[in-house]
Amino acid sequence: MATLHSPYRQDFDNNLKYNWSKRVAMSGIMRVFNACDECWAVNGSIKELYESDYGLKSACKVRLNATDHVPVPDAALAAREVDERYGIPSDATVFLFVGRINFIKNIDFAVRALARAKELGLKNFRMLFAGKGQDEDKLAALVQELGLTEEVVMCGLTDKDMLEKLYSRASLFLFPSLYDANSLVQIEAACQGTPAVFLEGARTASTITPGVNGYVCPASEDAYAHAIMDILADKDGYARVSAAARKDLYLSWDDVVRDVYADYLRLLGRN
């Protein structure tokens, strides 16, 4: 069996020069998957992509990702620890991105959207980037260019305990990536009741119900900025979405492993 998560054609289009080389690469990848007894896709959108566009013929089912994170026991204490470590005012609204600092994740979009939100009147906020990557210098230059040096905090790499506290401290998890298929970080955020804000057309948003346990908005910086401000203005609505994110989207690996084990036994028995 094999797992399906990466949008290979997109990777090959971005990194291979010649069409023949892209075809050879896709053919080689799909020969592997089509030789499997069963494939597991990380969400329904990826399953459809592989079956409709990539020519997957093997049996395929959706197997959702999960996390080993757990809800912080004391959110107020976690917030104080984060504020002290990163110099954040206790009354500041916090937004968070966790992952590779790479513009393929559309993190520059998030920064420009926040600059627009600041123009629209958003005050007293911090945008935390937790992670390392090849575009740290480019991101820092963009932050300076847009006048957000006070608002943007580069956290670097953190351990699991602090990462859970970062998710808990954040009001929103900003994830405008159009590249990711189904990221673990959105499940980690949901574990702490922190809803994610996605873009329309993002495959990684296919596991949420917009306005119920997460948010999806048009892929423009102005629309994203307005969405953030509208979400924060509707405190009752935000509380409902936050609770639903944890209830609907938080899934532990302990739960998933039981199902995976049963599937392994089923496949072994069939063969």
Predicted features along the sequence, with ranges:
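Membrane-proximal helix-turn-helix segments that form the acceptor-binding/catalytic region
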Residues: K22-C39
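Conserved donor-binding/catalytic core segment of Leloir-type glycosyltransferases
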Residues: W40, I88-K105, V111-L114
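Carbohydrate-associated surface elements
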Residues: S45, A66
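Short alpha-helical donor nucleotide-sugar binding micro-motif in glycosyltransferases
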Residues: L157-T158, K165-A170
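Aromatic "clamp/platform" in nucleotide-sugar-dependent glycosyltransferases that forms part
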Residues: L178
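Short hydrophobic beta-strand element within catalytic cores of glycosyltransferases
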Residues: P195-L199
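Conserved acidic donor-binding segment of nucleotide-sugar-dependent glycosyltransferases
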Residues: P210-G211, Y215-E221, D230-K235
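A short, well-ordered alpha-helix in the C-terminal region of glycosyltransferases
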Residues: G237-L251
